[in-house]
Amino acid sequence: VKQVSEKIKETGVDYIYFQFISVTGRIVGKGIPAAHWVCISEKGFQLVYGSTANLYVDRHGDYIGYGAESSELVGIPDPETFCQLPWDKRIGRVFCTLFRNREEQVNPGGALTSDCRGNLRRIHNEFQGKHDLNMRCGTEPEMMWLKRGE
């Protein structure tokens, strides 16, 4: 957290996107002035649970996954993911791990099951502990993106 604070001062970042991945793979999150970095790093930010499902609604107009009456999730930034955006030097971004609201009746402050990055981290840690191996994955570039002669 301290290193990121120093980097924010050095680079002149004045706004940070606190981001996470939705269940559809979309990057979503909340923008907060960089002056609040230390506080957000310790306490987190709150956002509606439905944001993990892109705030989509079903055909009846109800949020998918969580009702409008639900509490808000808590996002805690992962400082090692912080970087300054190359196309707008005033802005930084950091990925976050999501947790259930601290005031929930069931599992307060627990891991949020709709947090894709958090789930992957937990599953990978279990896998490493059980098998003493690392999961690795890669992408297969689609060759149809390329056209002969270009």
Residue map of PLM features:
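ATP/Mg2+-dependent ligation/transfer catalytic cores
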Residues: 1-150
